[in-house]
Curated annotation (Swiss-Prot):
GO terms for molecular function: toxin activity. One of its GO terms (cellular component) is extracellular region. Residues 1-19 form the signal peptide. This is U37-theraphotoxin-Cg1a. The keyword Magnesium does not apply. Its main location: secreted. Keywords: Secreted, Signal, Toxin. It comes from the Eukaryota. Belongs to the neurotoxin 10 (Hwtx-1) family. 67 (Jztx-67) subfamily. Expressed by the venom gland. The keyword Secreted applies. It is found in: Secreted.
Amino acid sequence: MRVLLIIAGLALLSVVCYTSEMKEQNSLNEVLSAFFDVEEPQEKGCIICF
């Protein structure tokens, strides 16, 4: 019984860590996406100029 609780606790801990890591990665992707969205119109303008 005790072993089962330990395994369940470890599984829950791994799920929580994985979820927080995914949220962190998503926020990083949003920042990078916003940065490249700001930069993109300038690139399009330069391509049109040529």
